[in-house]
Amino acid sequence: KYPENINLIESGLFHRFDATNILKKNLASIVTAIGLDHLDWLPKKEQTVEKIIFEKTSTLLNSKIIISKQSTNEISKSIEDTIIDNSSKKIIFNKDYNFTLKENDFFYFEDEFGALKLQKPNLPEEFQLENVSTAIATVRQLTDYKVTDENIKLGITKIESIARLQDLKSGKLKDL
């Protein structure tokens, strides 16, 4: 009905069993940080980081681009090794894109398209800046959609941290 729209779909650890697999055209797939908290979801004999990597990467074949942001170089290398035969373009944090904090209110993003000095979004934790940088890396790869650097600069100033990490300012929950 709305062919110009982009849908952002999240699937969890067991993506290969997820209903989102009905989507046949992926513009990009993002492999977010693999954490040991996923181990408890696996059968006892399969509770390894390698099994988590398999579950998160086994259905990436129909993606044009794969973006990966991991917490350690070892996990990042393991993911790269796992998807080496995948024909998708691979964009890896700290290899193909990165960010740095140099001033209180700014962070610097850099990828193959160049560097951006960006207003630091209203987010309390550094891992959230990692997520923002991964989103920027993704949108800059989608060159057919003509998202400009100005769009990115404006967009990140509008980010709000709601739900799990929301700072409650008033109300009954704040009073607890």
Label for each model-derived stretch:
Residues 2-74:
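Flexible active-site lid/hinge loop adjacent to a nucleotide/diphosphate
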Residues 89-95:
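A conserved beta-strand/loop element that lines the FAD pocket in flavoprotein oxidoreductases
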